[in-house]
Amino acid sequence: MRLPIFLDTDPGIDDAVAIAAAIFTPELDLQLMTTVAGNVSVEKTTRNALQLLHFWNVDIPLAQGAAVPLVRAPRDAASVHGESGMAGYDFVEHNRKPLGIPAFLAIRDALMRAPEPVTLVAIGPLTNIALLLSQCPECKPYIRRLVIMGGSAGRGNCTPNAEFNIAADPEAASCVFRSGIEIVMCGLDVTNQAILTPDYLATLPELNRTGKMLHALFSHYRSGSMQSGLRMHDLCAIAWLVRPELFTLKPCFVAVETQGEFTSGTTVVDIDGCLGKPANVKVALDLNVKGFQQWVAEVLALVP
């Protein structure tokens, strides 16, 4: 039985790998994609997502989502992914268009039509998910769980303590973490370990058409290097869905700092229970790196 999922994303070079895995992993049934501003503007993330769907010749509904955070000015990660979000490969022209409704309404409608609760996977800022939960609370029973790439129990990657996806819209993340839905958080504690080695990266051009495309994108990706290895942050959320045994999880109370002068966007992960509050998130704290790398190689070999 394949697991039905909806994927909220902001492609993004490592998003491209996660999208490939979500589409072609046999255990998963990707039924809806939505885009959000994050790595680059929502117009660019939508264009990039549609380019990938056309590249693989798959027909998955896609809705464009939030262009700006809930309350603050937007920020991006073009310095990591390039100005287009997926620099390095020339995709062919196409005439695909997103659905005519906002992402959070597309998620609502698809949830209400689904015959069983659906797993949401969010690998960008959580703006669309916060809009869904705040504007359509009747949807909560139809969400099986939310798996996110975001946050950190320790160091950040865009401030000393904050991870980019959370820091891009802390108010949205706070809304989601307080919602009461089941959440699995794959943050920097595991994603910084999720490295594809230079030796493996060198094999991609000979693997298949997708391998050639990803190798070209990776040459412009700034989360590591082709010489030292590249971190596959977003792919961890997909990996947990099908290979949860690769991850060490701990239930923790997690809150999002929205006020601090230096700490805004930080996920406060109460690993030791100091605050005495009930756990609201299952936090991934460690990763079987060899097992992850083997799984990635298996999945990418399945992609055309």
From Swiss-Prot:
It is an enzyme of class 3 (hydrolase). It comes from the Bacteria. The active site is at H233. Keywords: Glycosidase, Hydrolase. Its EC number is 3.2.-.-. PANTHER family: INOSINE-URIDINE PREFERRING NUCLEOSIDE HYDROLASE, NON-SPECIFIC RIBONUCLEOSIDE HYDROLASE RIHC. Hydrolyzes both purine and pyrimidine ribonucleosides with a broad-substrate specificity. This is Non-specific ribonucleoside hydrolase RihC.
